[in-house]
């Protein structure tokens, strides 16, 4: 499947690792999660090696919509029901902090980051939206 990212971005290539390597931390996977781990480790001066079996950002990251959100469908009602208020609050807070971190990172690079509103709707089950709002109000 073609991706907008592979059509519009020239990704760097790196030589294959040769011989034995010693590192404090090994990051397996060069998608967004792996690259972000490497970024934060580098900022802390921690020795790491990132390995990717194919091309950087060629897996899930390549096919992402690049939408960064804390709204992942109608999940908060389910989280409150199954995990409780405290853990649901921790999940929401972690997602909100991630959004803020992405925004701060994107101010340092040219990537056309924009904050936009998001919406959830239901044509058939409006009560699900009401449950979600109730969970978020808690």
Predicted segment positions?
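Dinucleotide-binding Rossmann-like beta1-alpha1 core, especially the glycine-rich loop
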Residues: 71-138
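Extreme N-terminal leader/targeting segments of oxidoreductases
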Residues: 1-25, 43
């Amino acid at each position: 499947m073609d991706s907008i990212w592979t059509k519009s971005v020239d990704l760097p290539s790196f030589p294959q690792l040769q011989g034995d390597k010693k590192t404090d931390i090994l990051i397996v996977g060069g998608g967004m999660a792996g690259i972000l781990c490497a970024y934060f480790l580098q900022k802390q001066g921690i020795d790491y090696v990132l390995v990717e079996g194919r091309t950087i950002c060629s897996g899930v990251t390549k096919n992402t919509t690049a939408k960064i959100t804390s709204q992942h469908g109608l999940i908060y009602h389910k989280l409150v029901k199954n995990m409780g208020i405290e853990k649901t609050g921790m999940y929401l807070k972690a997602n909100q902090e991630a959004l803020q971190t992405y925004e701060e990172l994107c101010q340092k690079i040219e990537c056309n980051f924009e904050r936009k509103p998001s919406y959830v709707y239901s044509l058939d089950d409006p009560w699900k939206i009401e449950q979600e709002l109730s969970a978020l109000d808690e």
